Structures are given as structure tokens and as C-alpha cells.
Amino acid sequence: MKIIFKVLILLLISSTFSNAELLNPNSTIKPKEVIKIQLTGLQKNDSKFKDSGIEQTWNFAHPNNKRVTGPLSNFKMMLKSDSYGMMINHLSHTITELGSSDKWAQFEVIILDKNKIYHKFNWQVEKYSLDGSLKDCWLTTMVSSPIPLGSSI
């Protein structure tokens, strides 16, 4: 019985520390930084704990986006699917701003996946305007389907 109790305590402590390692939205994080945080997490998906990169990405998803793609278990399945799986453990990425205002920003993201194939995405973030802990935080509202660009040399 003591062993089971110790194992449960260790599991609880490790999951608490693991989740504490993830960044959370705050109003000082700029639009491009939000995308960089998400992409870096996905690039190193299991570096902190299993699927930590996906959970990091989820933390910066707009509540409206979460309603469409969630709960988190569904979001994980979506990102591991053929449609978006190239984001997981990708080799590199570039982020280029296409346009912005004080309420939204649109970016072109190009990812080189682990099979050395390039994919292009349109990625949009918006500043959250409702009261609460997310007020004035930039959050992802939309990521397009990938457009394959071909392989690298």
C-alpha cells in the first residue's frame, strides 16, 4: 500500500512540474512570438513531457478555436493526423508577416518536415478583447490546411 501511495504522489508531482514548464499567454507576448512559441513546441513535441509541444500550442489557441478543435484530446489527434502531422517534430520553420492591425495579424509559415518536405500555412492570431485572464493576449484563431511546396535538396 505504501508503494502505491508513493507512486501516486510521484506521478502527481511530475505532472504538476511538467505542466508548469509550459508558457501561458500574457499581454506582453507579441503576435509573431505566439507563433514562434507554438512552432518551437511542435518542433520539439516530446521534449518536456509526452505531447508537451501540442499542449503548448493549445495554451495559445483562442477560445473560439478551442471550441472548434477541442477538447485537448481531439486537438492532439488532429495534430497527429495526416492533415497536420508534418508539424510534429519538424526540422525548421520560417514565419513571415503578411499584414496586421492592432487587433489581428496574418503570417505565412513554412515548415520543413522530418521527411525534408516543405509545407506552407496561413496562420492568424487575434488580440483577445473580453475581460479575464486572456484579455489583450494574442491567440491563434486560424491555421490553414498545409500547402505542400516540395522537397528540399
Task: List each model region and its residues.
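Hydrophobic h-region of N-terminal signal peptides that target proteins for export
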Residues: 10-18
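Sec-dependent signal peptide recognition
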Residues: 2-10
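Short, aromatic-enriched amphipathic alpha-helices that serve as compact interaction elements
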Residues: 30-46, 60
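Exposed beta-sheet edge and beta->alpha loop/turn motif
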Residues: 97-153
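Charged, low-complexity intrinsically disordered segments
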Residues: 27-32, 105
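Boundary at the C-terminal end of the N-terminal hydrophobic targeting segment
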Residues: 18-25
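Short solvent-exposed beta->alpha transition segments
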Residues: 48-102
